[in-house]
Amino acid sequence: MKTQMIRSLTFQDGNAEVAMNFYVELFEDSRVLKVSRWPEGGPVEKGKIMQATFELNGNLFMCSDSPPAHEWDFTPAVSNYIECDNMTEVKRLFSRLSEDGTVTMPLNDYGFSSCFGWVIIK
């Protein structure tokens, strides 16, 4: 069995490159691995991301500028969970992810965790 059998794939509605670069710059040991772009005459603007794979601190993710308009969007029912080694890193990441986002649970002790926060990013 592969080390990471399940990967996140997000459809970004034209913002895949911005989102991918934001994450790669935010997390240490991260990089873009592969980018395939839509050609001229494709279902979306030429150069938009058909499919991209990137690595965030050893974990693989994928994104796409999906061409059809979907009735669905991101949902908090499926979320990415970040674990940090120290409070400095927790605060740095939470602060950056909260910029222009919606904090649904500020960093706090909620009983099930001494330091937990939940943010819906931009």
What is each of the regions a protein language model found here?
Residues 2-5, 9-11, 33, 55, ...:
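Vicinal oxygen chelate
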Residues 9-58:
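Core segments of cupin and vicinal oxygen chelate
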Residues 46-47, 73-75:
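Short glycine/proline-enriched turns and hinge-like loops at secondary-structure junctions
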